[in-house]
Amino acid sequence: MRHARGYRRLNRTHEHRKALWANMAGSLIEHEQIKTTLPKAKELRPIIEKMITLAKRGDLHARRQAASKLKEDQYVAKLFDVLGPRYKDRQGGYVRVLKAGFRYGDMAPMAIIEFVDRDRDAKGAADRARLAAEENAEEA
């Protein structure tokens, strides 16, 4: 019987899974779309949904709860300043998981997980800013 088997272990320890979800949630918040394996994407969805719900609350306790799950303060800031207000009228269903074929090396099923009303310019924004800063430094 599979009683009390509510999540995928993904062949990792509890601490490794906790770090994995913190890193993946931060990447998804920063880029608003990431590509990963299908089981990881399916497990990440409820974690992100709960964080968006915390961001919609917007109080100090919710911010501290989100900060305890995420690794960097910039992710918490974007979560509460950008994503929370964006989804204030939506009652759940903030992210979607799209199947994306199979990985070449090991045929693992891949998926794209993204926010529903995502900002298409967010993906790669840090790289564009870094390249622009390097070009300005070379010109000066």
Curated annotation (Swiss-Prot):
Domain of life from the UniProt record: Bacteria
Keyword GTP-binding: no
GO molecular function: structural constituent of ribosome
Gene3D superfamilies: Ribosomal protein L17 (3.90.1030.10)
Keyword Translocase (UniProt): no
GO biological process: translation
Xref: PANTHER family: LARGE RIBOSOMAL SUBUNIT PROTEIN BL17M (PTHR14413:SF16), RIBOSOMAL PROTEIN L17 (PTHR14413)
Subunit description: Part of the 50S ribosomal subunit. Contacts protein L32.
Record's protein name: Large ribosomal subunit protein bL17
Organism: Roseobacter denitrificans (strain ATCC 33942 / OCh 114)
Protein encoded by which gene: rplQ
